[in-house]
Amino acid sequence: MHARKILQSAAVLALSAALTLPAGPAQAAAGPNTDFNGDGYNDLAVGSPSYPGYPGTKNSGLVAVLFGGPDGLTYNRHIIRPAPGCTAGGLPCEAWGVNLSAADVDADGRTDLISRGHYDLQVDSWTSQGTATIERRVYGHRTAPWRLMSGQFDDQPGTDIVGPTRGGYWFSVGGWYNRSANLLFTDFADDSYLTKETSAASGDLDGDGKLEIAVVAGRHSGAGELGPHLWLIDDPHRPQVQLTTLGSPSTCTSPPSYGQGCPKADSEVAMGNVNGDGHDDLVMLTPSTASLQVWYGRATGPSSAPGYTVDLSSLATSAELGPGLAVGDVNGDGWAEIVIGASKATVSGHSEAGAVMVIPGSATGPVIKRAQLVTQDGIGPVGGTALADPIAEQSKPGDRFGQAITITDLTGDGKGEVIVGAPAKNGGSGMLAVLFGSATGVLTSTAQAIHPSRYGLNSTQAYFGGVLLK
């Protein structure tokens, strides 16, 4: 390890709208329950859709379930991988682990893992007797939900599995509601069709106990192709769904209007309780405009305009930002942090080595002036000198540290760990960094560097850390 100055092109902290940090208690938001084996510690699922299949098969991909404990990720793991002979409607079981979700599907009080490949998905459940696949859905084509989300989306009992659905050029929202075997597609109340969906997230923005879906997608109507929009969808199980527009080309100017929220094809969305008021908030990162917006949740739903916006161009260039984005409480104060990936950032002279930025939350929103920059070479204030070097690795060209990010409380202390994927490290084998949460933010004294070989995964096509359960 080398504690050195974090050299990131354009990494200078001179952002406007820096906020002060008010005192006061808030509702915790350390992340979802992902305790699969019921031992009291959250676990992590890592997808490796490019992992080679068994010799002689056309199958590919796997999911590694890594179990948490008081010291972080343990050596225990469970591998889900298409078996020889596995087919999905006559097609190979390929790209397993391309998407992951978690919920208590069978209502037994334990969280189940939902994973999918290109043509099928399955639900795996842990019991005292072991692990079993309790559901499998074979759709044989790519029109099923391809960005899985799970939980309570409608007002009927039972877990729903939903997501944006590709059907040729068009997108809709489809899903299996309340453990139904039938895949139901959503019709929209107007003449809109979604096109080119690029990002989606779910959360409870209005506090009614049901999840809403935010999606970045193009729109096509009688007027033709209308460009990227940020939509909010409430209860996709209804016969006709009304789309609420939070951002569209009409909110964009040249240069972009950061105050209004300008969705682009590369925009990423996530949800979490940034201001600690008990409602999830919607966060959008747009690398091409180097901007970040937050729509605050409230009982009547979010405002049509973002309540917080900032220009990130003095922090990192648009070419460096994204696609990693996660929201969760890292320091246990009840205000969720926003963690942004800059996977193509130049670090210590190494191009596309990657970095992540941890922005604290507060009762009034993100506190940019207290942001931390984390690379494999050190951690410190953005644009400053590394104060410590907890990761037992060094930045290398093309590592893509920050390509994927999730926040999960692995240790059970009420503070979320920031888990960062570097899928291109070591020639494509990949790596995870577990940055422990603490009362002062990301812990600077120690971290975990997790290589796939630790779990018997030894392919340079693993790209381990490219897909993480959120």
For each of these PLM feature ranges, what is it?
Residues 29-41, 97-105, 146-154, 159, ...:
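Beta-propeller blade termini
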Residues 13, 17-30, 67-95, 123-147, ...:
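Blade-edge motifs of beta-propeller repeat domains
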Residues 57-62, 120, 225-229, 289-291, ...:
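A detector of repeated loop/turn-to-beta-strand junctions in beta-rich toroidal repeat architectures
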Residues 44-46, 63-66, 96, 113, ...:
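Hydrophobic strand positions within the blades of repeat-based beta-sheet folds
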